Regions:
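Interface amphipathic segments
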Residues: 1-110, 117-184
Length: 184
């Protein structure tokens, strides 16, 4: 359901024009992704004066879910938080159309987005117990990653644990944005 509301300007506002606010209410509905039924839970999205507010957006399937809450705007302090629980990484790589590498495994943790319109401060803190890289199962991955705006890539720092006494530290970039110097 979508509702458009014309707000009168505040009396002390320098800009005396009315403001259009858009309120979107999402209702519970099934969603099929790769032949699997997920459920979109009730939530709301508000658009007003360049701000996008997302309240309690959730897509879930049993114990697996993606939960999105927060605000995207020009204000660098506004944050959008994405919580993952047992969420298959392969879906994310398919959606982002990242073909050079293939990460799979069920991730649990947080993804934070700030200052999306400028420096794009994006970061993750994830645990993937059954992590695979290019179809090779490696073990449990503890991963921190963040967007590096200067590199136009995602810096990934983590540790992969095969067992309690064997692990590998990983560090590197993924470049999801094509630039002339990265053309095939």
């Amino acid at each position: 359901t979508t509702c458009f509301v014309m707000e009168e300007p505040e009396e002390d506002a320098a800009d005396s024009k009315p403001v259009l606010r858009t309120e979107i209410a999402l209702h519970e509905t099934p969603l099929v992704i790769n032949d699997t039924t997920w459920y979109v839970r009730p939530s709301s999205v508000t658009l007003r004066k360049g701000k996008i507010g997302i309240d309690n957006f959730e897509v879930e399937r049993g114990s697996q879910y993606v939960h999105l809450n927060g605000t995207v705007s020009q204000d660098v302090t506004d944050t959008l938080k994405l919580d993952l629980n047992n969420f298959e990484l392969g879906y994310i790589f398919d959606i982002l159309n990242i073909e050079n590498v293939k990460f799979t495994g069920k991730a649990t943790g947080q993804f934070n987005i700030c200052d999306l319109y400028s420096s794009r401060m994006l970061s993750t803190d994830l645990v993937i117990p059954d992590f695979s890289f290019n179809n090779v199962r490696l073990g449990r991955l503890n991963l921190f990653s963040e967007w590096d705006d200067a590199q136009r890539g995602i810096l990934m720092l983590g540790s992969i644990y095969k067992n309690d006494s064997t692990w590998t530290d990983v560090s590197g970039y993924i470049y999801p944005v094509r630039t002339p110097e990265r053309e095939p």
